[in-house]
């Protein structure tokens, strides 16, 4: 039993919509914004893997692995900056980020 391509695309579209809604609706918490960006990247990966499997080509799956690697590095760096910012300022509000200049 195989799952049709349209169902994969529907799940990816739902994940993408949730990620965009998370960014639009919650602009005050940087952790929620980082998680929303990760959801968007995962939806893109799901699209790549679904189309790759549908077409019988491994290129999309390999590209998805590269995107996962970059997303993991982005999350690690983002969280490290967040922890440093919280230690220095005592807040993780997006409004306070402009004080990082210099």
Curated annotation (Swiss-Prot):
Report the GO terms under cellular component: NADH dehydrogenase complex; plasma membrane
| Keyword Cell inner membrane applies | yes
- Report how it sits in the membrane: Multi-pass membrane protein
Top-level taxon in the UniProt lineage:
Bacteria
Name the predominant localization.
membrane
Which residue spans traverse the membrane? 5-25, 30-50, 62-82
| Keyword terms of this UniProt record | Cell inner membrane, Cell membrane, Membrane, NAD, Quinone, Translocase, Transmembrane, Transmembrane helix, Transport, Ubiquinone
GO biological process terms, semicolon-separated: ATP synthesis coupled electron transport
A matching Pfam family: Oxidored_q2
Q: What EC number(s) does its UniProt record assign? A: 7.1.1.-
Q: Which reaction does it catalyse?
A: a quinone + NADH + 5 H(+)(in) = a quinol + NAD(+) + 4 H(+)(out)
Question: Which GO MF terms are attached to this record?
Answer: NADH:ubiquinone reductase (non-electrogenic) activity; quinone binding
Location of this chain's protein in the cell = Cell inner membrane
Q: Subunit comment for this entry?
A: NDH-1 is composed of 14 different subunits. Subunits NuoA, H, J, K, L, M, N constitute the membrane sector of the complex.
Task: Provide the function of this protein.
Answer: NDH-1 shuttles electrons from NADH, via FMN and iron-sulfur (Fe-S) centers, to quinones in the respiratory chain. The immediate electron acceptor for the enzyme in this species is believed to be ubiquinone. Couples the redox reaction to proton translocation (for every two electrons transferred, four hydrogen ions are translocated across the cytoplasmic membrane), and thus conserves the redox energy in a proton gradient.
Name of the featured protein:
NADH-quinone oxidoreductase subunit K
Which species is the source of this protein? Answer: Beijerinckia indica subsp. indica (strain ATCC 9039 / DSM 1715 / NCIMB 8712)
